[in-house]
C-alpha cells in the first residue's frame, strides 16, 4: 500500500510518467521511443509511445515472412516488458502515490507505436492549478 500523499497536478503526473517510461525504454529495452505521452484518466494511466521499433525489428516486420516476423517482435517485446514490469510498476506508484492493479500493453509492428495501460487501485490525488487572475 502506498501511503505518502503526493501533491501534483494532472499535468505534472503525466509528464513524470512520460519521462519514467522513456527512461525505462532506453535503459531496459535498449532504445527509447521518439515520443511518449501519458494520459491520466481517473484510475487509468494510458501511455502512447511512438517509433519504438529498432531498425532490425523494422526490417523483420517488412520481410517476406512478415507475419511471422511481426508475431515474433510482439512476443519478444511483451516478454521483455513483463520481465521489467516490477520496475515500471514501482516507478508509476512512486509518481502517483497509488498502487498499480494491472498493466496491459500492445505494440503495432506496422506503425511502430506501443500503448501501455496501467489500472490503479484508486484515482491518484490531483491538485488543481490555481486560476490566473486578471489585473
Give a label for each model feature.
Residues 2-135:
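Interaction-mediating elements
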